[in-house]
UniProtKB/Swiss-Prot annotation:
GO terms for biological process: DNA recombination; regulation of DNA-templated transcription; regulation of translation. CDD domains: IHF_B. Heterodimer of an alpha and a beta chain. It comes from the Bacteria. PANTHER family: DNA-BINDING PROTEIN HU, INTEGRATION HOST FACTOR SUBUNIT BETA. InterPro entries: Hist_DNA-bd, Histone-like_DNA-bd_CS, IHF-like_DNA-bd_dom_sf, IHF_beta. This is Integration host factor subunit beta. Keywords: DNA recombination, DNA-binding, Transcription, Transcription regulation, Translation regulation. SUPFAM superfamilies: IHF-like DNA-binding proteins. This protein is one of the two subunits of integration host factor, a specific DNA-binding protein that functions in genetic recombination as well as in transcriptional and translational control. It holds the Pfam family Bac_DNA_binding.
C-alpha cells in the first residue's frame, strides 16, 4: 500500500473529514515519526510495532560492476519490529 492509497482509504472511511485534511494529517504523522528517528528516539505503536535505529559497523563492500573493494562507512538504519498483535494478524498458518 502506498501513501496515496492509505489516504484514499482513510477518506473513504471518514466521510466527515475533508480529503485535504486527511492528506495533511498523514503527512504530519510521517514527518513526526521521521523527526523522532532523526533524534535517535524509538517509536512504539502498541499492537502494531516499533521503529528504532540500528547501527551498522563500517565494513568492506564490493562494487558489483567492477568487483573492486569499497570501504563503507558506519551508519544508522531504520528498523521495524512488528508487535504481537500484528504478527498474529498476518500469520496465515495460525
Amino acid at each position: 500500500m502506498t501513501k496515496s492509497e492509505l489516504i484514499e482509504r482513510l477518506v473513504q472511511k471518514c466521510h466527515a473529514v475533508a480529503a485535504k485534511d486527511v492528506e495533511n494529517a498523514v503527512k504530519e504523522i510521517l514527518d513526526q515519526m521521521s523527526f523522532a528517528l532523526e533524534s535517535g528516539k524509538r517509536i512504539e505503536v502498541r499492537g502494531f510495532g516499533s521503529f528504532s535505529l540500528h547501527y551498522r559497523q563500517p565494513r568492506l563492500g564490493r562494487n558489483p560492476k567492477t568487483g573492486e573493494q569499497v570501504k563503507l562507512d558506519a551508519k544508522s538504519v531504520p528498523h521495524f519490529k512488528a508487535g504481537k498483535e500484528l504478527r498474529e494478524r498476518v500469520d496465515i498458518y495460525a
